[in-house]
Every structure is written in structure tokens, then in C-alpha cells.
Amino acid sequence: MTFAPLQNDRFLRALNRETVDRTPIWMMRQAGRYLPEYRAAREHAGSFMDLCKNADLACEVTLQPLERYPLDAAILFSDILTIPDAMGLGLYFETGEGPKFRKVVRTEADVAALPIPDAESDLGYVMNAVSTIRGALNGRVPLIGFSGSPWTLATYMVEGGSSKDFRHLKAMVYSQPELAHAMLDKLAQSVTGYLNAQIRHGAQAVQIFDTWGGALSAEAYKEFSLRYMQQIVDGLIRDNEGRKVPVILFTKNGGLWLESMAATGCDALGLDWTINIGDARRRVGDKVALQGNMDPAVLYASPQAIRAEVKRILDDFGDHPGHIFNLGHGITPQVDPEHAKVFIEAVVELSQK
């Protein structure tokens, strides 16, 4: 596939810790329910998964935030649970309760029965969306592909949906570690194939979302989450279309383990808001770029407070290469789009070199 040349490579340059004219910015969940035009598209699609599975609609909602704001990257509109769904677990959504699976994975027989999905055929709708979005971007900004981490996917597969304490999976980790490893290895193989297919179809950077890795002890994190993200990083296509394909790891509540994460060979770490970005830069900034890390709840505050927090984070990071501004987690549905605009424009204005 041949695509238009990239006009704005600020995001990719920052990921490689090269100098940029200002700090690039994008937001996790930037195509989402806070935008009225997204809500209209979702209603038109009929359901969230119908929206994900229609390449034209997925493309439309991916581009919506770029029409409103001066963002430096687009991120594929999809869901982290596409892989377990393709494994036959029956993903569905209950209003107000989030994602659920019709089948759970808790026994040796359950794990043995899990197929490794073929990204091109079993997840072809995602690849159609990637190539459609990349074509429609026409070189405006880079396209980010993504996946959930093996550990995070496993939490949903074993618990059957969202969980506060992950008791079934944690019991497996401590009572039957070999069973947990067998499942996580299958997931790591699946994620590697899935992200490589996204890269072949046009993703110019990829992010691994380890939303629940921070729920683990330090030892368990290294053994059951980081180990499998390392396996994925080792197996990814790192050059495509004559350019490096950067990899971002994001473990929510992973601030204690940045050095171990940076040692995986990834290009950048996503940070949540619980860590000072200046401290993070002093710890690992010579190895990786850093992405983050404003508390999404600041977007409910006044415009003046939003600008002040942007300035604080920029000042804390300092005049160094390798910063991509983002929120510390996804933007939430009740945020006023005008407040998101204040945030993004503050980053653009206050970070000009």
C-alpha cells in the first residue's frame, strides 16, 4: 500500500527524542463520547462494535477530533478487546456496565481451546479500518495503532468483564502460574501478530495499553505483565515505509517500574498523572521518550486552571527532547469539548520553541 507523504511528523520525531518546534499532543480516547458528533455517529451505527466494524464509520470518528483541534496524531478507533472477541469469547456490552464476555477462561481446557487469531482474516475489519483511516488522513498526521497488553486482556477474559480486584485471575497467578503463563503467551503471540498487521496496513506507531498492570505486586508485574510486553516488543516490525515504527508502553499506575519498562527496548513510556514527569525524565529520559501526563479530571476545572496545569507539566519536563503531551488516561465522556480545546491550544501555545 502506498500512502501520501507525511506532512506533520512532530509526533514521530518526539518519539525518537529528536528536536521539534513545539510539544506534540494527542489525547487517549480523543475520538469519544465527549464529542456530540461521535455520539451521533455511534447512534447511526447502532452499537459500539458496529461502529468499530464499519471501516467508513470508524474512519469518520477517528478524524472527528482532528477537525476540531490542532492534534499531532490520530489513533485507530477500535476497542482493546477485539483479540479475545476473535478468540471466540463472545464480547458484548451492557449499558452502564461496560464490556462482558459470554465465555470465561479459567481452566486448562479453556486455555487449551483458545485459538491464536489470524489478524488478516479474523480481525480483518480492524485492518480495513487502519488502511481506510490512513488513506483518509492523506499525510496530515501519523496514525497510531494499538492493542491491550496480554495481562490487561487476560483480566477481562478470566473475570468475564471489568473487575475491581481481579480475584479469579490473581488466584490463577498464585495457584496455577503455569496456566496463567500459557494463556499470556498465547495472548502475546496474538498481540504481536495483530500489531504487525496494523503496521503493514498503515499504522505509523503503536501503543500497548496495560491498563491493569498497576494492580500487580512488583514481582508479579515483571513476571505476568512486563515479560509479555517485552515478548511483543521483540517481535514487532520496527521499520516500515522507510521509517522507524515507534512503540509506546503504557502501564497505568506503573510509575514505580519505569526503569524496567524502559529496558524493554520500547521507544516511549506513557505516564499516568500520579508521577511527576520531571522525575520520570530524570529516571529514564536518556533511554525513552515520555508521553503524558495531565489528570483527565483537570478538564472539568476552569480554563485558567487547565492552562496552569499544562504550564506546570511543561515546566516540570523542561527544555529537553522526547515529550509528547497527553492525558494520564482517556478523556472522560462528560468533558466539555471547549475545555478540551483550551487544553490542546494551551499545549500548542505554551510549548512553542
Swiss-Prot record:
Organism (species): Alcanivorax borkumensis (strain ATCC 700651 / DSM 11573 / NCIMB 13689 / SK2)
Protein name: Uroporphyrinogen decarboxylase
Catalytic reaction list: uroporphyrinogen III + 4 H(+) = coproporphyrinogen III + 4 CO2
Described function: Catalyzes the decarboxylation of four acetate groups of uroporphyrinogen-III to yield coproporphyrinogen-III.
GO molecular function, one term: uroporphyrinogen decarboxylase activity
Chain sites annotated for binding substrate: 29-33, 79, 156, 211, 329
HAMAP family associated with the record: URO_D
Pathway(s) served: Porphyrin-containing compound metabolism; protoporphyrin-IX biosynthesis; coproporphyrinogen-III from 5-aminolevulinate: step 4/4
Site positions per UniProt: Transition state stabilizer: 79
Gene, per the UniProt record: hemE
One Gene Ontology CC term in the entry: cytosol
Gene3D superfamilies xrefs: 3.20.20.210
Keywords attached to this entry: Cytoplasm, Decarboxylase, Lyase, Porphyrin biosynthesis
